Amino acid sequence: IAECLVGSEMCIRDRIGTEHEKFGFKKKDLRPISVDDIQKIFSELCSKYKWEKIIESSKIIGLKKDATSITLEPGGQIELSGAPVKNLFETCKEVNLHQDELNAVCRNYEIEFMGIGVLPKWKLSDLKLMPKKRYEIMSKYMPLVGEMGLDMMKRTTTIQANFDFASESDMKKKFRVAQSIQPVIIALY
């Protein structure tokens, strides 16, 4: 753990990255944000912070800047896919910068974000499927393979950590450490 905190030789070679999803909601009625809201947010992020648009079927479905991207998830969740970085401090800085940019843009629209794993109050019908061909295909497939697939797509978020590894044994070691510290991380947050 200490090696990744301070950027030891191993972590200078190997990189870590995070994927951070969040739900947007309107402050006035605590309802989910719409596709139109997301289009405004993404457009303003481009103009104010120099993100580049990713377009599909004339809709902005994501943004990119250097090795970082912001994507639109099936139920309107917004995800930061971070760049590969040297240590946890850099990924923390990256997530904080993203949240600061998002908050600055969304303040004008009275939109805020929450980091919650699952939405207990909003129903599937409250969350419109986002305009990505992939999600259209997934939304037809998920009900065929289980009862909660659509809920997973539209009503959940996660934070994922991605670790480079040099070999299978290196991957096993990192996986064991990550699993061992997971209860501590959960307790902290």
Predicted segment positions?
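Single conserved hydrophobic/aromatic residue that forms the stacking wall/gate
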Residues: I1-G7, I12
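Short beta-strand/turn micro-motifs at beta-sheet edges
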Residues: E9, D66-I70, E147-D151
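Short secondary-structure junctions and interdomain/linker hinges
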Residues: E9, K48-E52, Y109, V145, ...
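Hydrophobic alpha-helical membrane-insertion signals
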Residues: R13-I41
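A generic structural signal for short, non-catalytic loop/turn and secondary-structure boundary residues
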Residues: R15-T18, E56, L63-K65, E73, ...
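Glycine-rich, often proline-containing surface loops adjacent to acidic residues and nearby aromatics
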Residues: T18-F23, L72-L88, M153-D164
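Active-site acidic/histidine clusters and adjacent loop/turn architecture
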Residues: L30-P120
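Loop-rich catalytic cores of soluble enzymes, especially ATP-dependent carboxylate-amine ligases
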Residues: V118-Y189
